[in-house]
Curated annotation (Swiss-Prot):
GO terms for biological process: cellular response to interleukin-4; cellular response to transforming growth factor beta stimulus; chemotaxis; establishment of localization in cell; immune response; mature natural killer cell chemotaxis; negative regulation of CD4-positive, alpha-beta T cell proliferation; negative regulation of DNA-templated transcription. InterPro entries: Chemokine_b/g/d (IPR039809), Chemokine_IL8-like_dom (IPR001811), Chemokine_XCL1/XCL2 (IPR008105), Interleukin_8-like_sf (IPR036048). Residues 100-114 have a biased composition (Polar residues). This is Lymphotactin. One of its GO terms (cellular component) is extracellular space. It comes from Mus musculus. It comes from the Eukaryota. Chemotactic activity for lymphocytes but not for monocytes or neutrophils. In thymus, mediates medullary accumulation of thymic dendritic cells and contributes to regulatoy T cell development, playing a role in self-tolerance establishment. Pfam families: IL8. PANTHER family: CYTOKINE SCM-1 BETA-RELATED, SMALL INDUCIBLE CYTOKINE A. One of its GO terms (molecular function) is protein homodimerization activity.
Length: 114
């Protein structure tokens, strides 16, 4: 009885390592299978990811959350990346801008004496 219990306990302890090995066969979530050749409107692109996996690609993420793989060597892809980077740097510059001039106080405390 003790031998059976000890064997069962040993199998339970080894199970996590055996199951972990099976998961390595699953493809990664963001891997590209094929590349988009048709030009994507730049105004629909929110951001992009440069993918260096089995297939080198640029993954564009649209404003609706769709992920589209494209050839990083295509001219339209390079132009889209420049545009998206330009928008990001413009937003960053606007966020870093400090307003000049005096600002009025927004505190409107009223003191009553009686």
């Amino acid at each position: 009885m003790r031998l059976l219990l000890l064997t069962f306990l040993g199998v339970c302890c080894l199970t996590p390592w055996v199951v972990e090995g099976v998961g390595t066969e699953v493809l990664e979530e963001s891997s590209c299978v094929n590349l988009q050749t048709q030009r994507l409107p730049v105004q629909k692109i929110k951001t992009y990811i440069i993918w260096e996996g089995a297939m080198r690609a640029v993954i564009f993420v649209t404003k609706r959350g769709l992920k589209i793989c494209a050839d990083p060597e295509a001219k339209w892809v390079k132009a889209a990346i420049k545009t998206v980077d330009g928008r990001a740097s413009t937003r960053k510059n606007m966020a870093e801008t400090v307003p000049t001039g005096a600002q009025r106080s927004t505190s409107t405390a009223i003191t009553l004496t009686g």
